[in-house]
Amino acid sequence: MNNSASVLDPAGALSRSDELAAAGLWDDAIRLLTEANRNEERSDVERRLLKLRHLAFAEMKDSVPVPVWPKPVPDYFPQETSIPEIHASELTADIVNSAITHHGSLMVRGMVDPNVAEGIREAIDHAFDSAAEAENPLTPLPPWYLPFRAHRKGDYSFGGPERTYVREGGGLHAVDAPRALFRHIEALSAVGFDRMLRDYFGEPVAFSAKKTTLRRTEPGALAGWHQDGAFLGTETRSLNIWTALSPCGVDAASLDILPRRIDTLVEMGGPDIFDWAISNETAEKYAAKDIVRPVFETGDALLFDQLTLHRTGVDSHMTKTRYAIEMWCFAASTYPHEQIPLCW
């Protein structure tokens, strides 16, 4: 495809993307609108991009999973007893695989440029403020808050209750804030994260509408221990990227995480907690004294999967708001349908 987005006005780009989608050229349609929106951010283009990403998954031919996954890799961090760390310039699928397989997570410093992170934070603030002003969770207030509509043929559940639940936890679905999500995807693509994902899974990649979340966490927020495999299943091939958009771990909440691999779901439930949550007693049994609370600078990211034991890491002395984006990505062949897929 040529770079026609550089000469097409937004209306022309939207029209041409429809033609490409109708011809089954989904990647070209997404690329065209991405280039158009780089030139001029527009809410109609951003919203159409999300629709195309969602419809493209529905039209995708059956993705074939890699027979052996994850592939066997050596431990590239044999002396590490905490969370392995690399810089974004060192990011490869083998490094991620090694860290997740042998240590349970990987810290990637400098994943997002701090100046770019500032623009994403701005979009997050606008999105949260617009969502608060909306008459109800499904009322759009462009350009910052545009509730996403899943394809009706997918039999998805994604209405007001799901959004209210996430809001009560200090979050906002990123698909409801297309500009913030667009800026975030652009930032990750700038360091090759999209290519790394394809190499990591060995097949096309999708991210989740329900579990890609903007975080604006106020001081004092609490969240219990959990493994996301309680929602996603243990056989799903997943990778979460948790990106700090402000400093975290000193004056603002971070994450508490077990820096070693667990291959199963641990015992869940207990008095006064959700049936998917893990009690402090159970977490301590598995973690002993190994729990780590990493310190993030703006733009650092933590990678982990659905078996990683973690929670929000917060203390009473933390007085600043935490900004972050959590983005769950999946191998297309094992995508958990109820999470509502969008192609990368």
Q: Which residues are covered by each model-predicted region?
A:
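Short beta-strand His + acidic residue motifs that chelate non-heme Fe in jelly-roll/DSBH
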Residues: 310-318
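Conserved short histidine dyad/triad with adjacent acidic residue
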Residues: 215-228, 248, 306-311
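Fe(II)/2-oxoglutarate
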Residues: 1-102
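Acidic, His- and aromatic-enriched active-site or binding-groove loops in soluble protein domains
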Residues: 225-242
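Double-stranded beta-helix
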Residues: 248-309, 334
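A short hydrophobic beta-strand segment most commonly corresponding to one strand
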Residues: 240-243, 319-335
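Signature of the catalytic double-stranded beta-helix
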Residues: 112, 123, 152-211
